[in-house]
């Protein structure tokens, strides 16, 4: 976690007050929130995989979630859609993944159709593997807007 703080991630001051808190072995921290702009935010969680207690600042990144509160919709007017698109594009200046933040479900599946799970209720696609050490899994979960199939949320989780 300290690397992200040193790198300039603008965690909330009230949450940074917790970085000295103890994290027991095999436990995760609470969720840290970062507002990228009025429409885009991120969340982070950290894990202690050592055999001893450590502080939250020493814990390893185990979860990242990027999400847009709003994405363009077919029933929104053009100016509203332009505003949402601009907020997402603006967030891409501060947050980089190996795919565009304007990714559509079709584009994702064209590049990799080996998903481990499809969820029609959430219009999501997952690429996950089971952890070899802990109960749970690691991987990517992409959630798309049901109307436009535009990416609205990505979460990346890691367990050894």
Question: Could you say what each language-model-derived stretch is?
Answer:
Residues 5-71, 83, 87-150, 156-160:
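A cross-family detector of function-defining hotspots
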């Amino acid at each position: 976690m300290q690397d992200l703080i040193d790198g300039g991630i603008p965690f909330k001051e009230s949450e940074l007050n917790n970085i000295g808190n103890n994290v027991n072995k095999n436990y995760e921290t609470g969720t840290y929130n970062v507002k990228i702009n009025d429409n885009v935010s991120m969340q982070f969680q950290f894990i202690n995989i050592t055999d001893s207690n450590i502080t939250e600042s020493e814990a390893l990144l185990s979860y990242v979630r990027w999400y847009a509160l709003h994405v363009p919709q077919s029933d929104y007017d053009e100016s509203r859609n332009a505003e949402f698109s601009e907020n997402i594009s603006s967030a891409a200046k501060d947050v980089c993944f190996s795919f565009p933040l304007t990714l559509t479900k079709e584009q994702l599946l064209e590049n990799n159709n080996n998903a481990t799970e499809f969820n029609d209720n959430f219009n999501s696609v997952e690429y996950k593997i089971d952890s070899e050490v802990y109960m749970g899994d690691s991987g990517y979960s992409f959630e798309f807007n049901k109307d436009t199939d535009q990416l609205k949320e990505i979460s990346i989780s890691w367990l050894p």
